[in-house]
């Protein structure tokens, strides 16, 4: 296979997205010094619509379409995504070629005045961008007011600093990647705020026909992270996972096994269905599918029927 002399990485324009793309660029440059690696910065529809929640405007696919168009028309060879933003069903001619080692998958509590969610007084406003976080906060702290929070990371922090919220809840990985870990007042353990499928991981998308790019990316992948996110995304896929569904799935490697936890919640947090499964890490897909079936059998089907036009059958 002929050596690739030039690679172009498609990325969103936010500071966090650029950090992620630059990280992949630096890894590729270090491994393939003879290859020129550059960035193509694009603005996605998801970046432009900031006055409505993702669940009301089309979901996660809004952050990838423009990058996929760049792959199709040859302007880019690969696209770097936060994996939690990548739809679980990538249709031809696209493929998720590589998953890098995961950063911290947890959610982070950020506030200028309070140390934790438990410290917030009744009626305090908490900002979050996802139904998943909202439902879990409402379940544990029904006295708090959860409000939508959109925009890039700097915009969200700015809204907190302007007094729009008493606290906000964000992905810890994004804060840490941008050197903002000092803003974190508390990390929310999975038992308290189960992460989204793929949270903290970076995924690289290419065209299925680009075997040359796939071969170059292979050494960048992390097998343990791939197993975990495969199980998590299997849960989401079977349940029609989208921004319209308060769905969480988090897997970790425990010795030779993969341990998975998943939940589906009603947006108001009054109903939460949970499932746990474990097994050999090479059975990640099956473990995720089994957990999804457990959720459906235990009542998630009723929640999904209220949220989705056509909900999955157990």
UniProtKB/Swiss-Prot annotation:
GO MF terms held by the record: hydroxymethylbilane synthase activity
Specify whether Cell wall biogenesis/degradation is a keyword of the entry: no
User: Listed GO cellular component terms?
Assistant: cytoplasm
S-(dipyrrolylmethanemethyl)cysteine found at: 243
Name the Gene Ontology biological process terms.
Answer: protoporphyrinogen IX biosynthetic process
Main EC class of this protein? transferase
Identify the EC number(s): 2.5.1.61
PANTHER family tied to this protein:
PORPHOBILINOGEN DEAMINASE
How is this protein organized at the quaternary level? Monomer.
Q: Any remaining note in the record?
A: The porphobilinogen subunits are added to the dipyrromethane group.
What is the name attached to this protein's record? Porphobilinogen deaminase
| Organism listed in the record | Bordetella parapertussis (strain 12822 / ATCC BAA-587 / NCTC 13253)
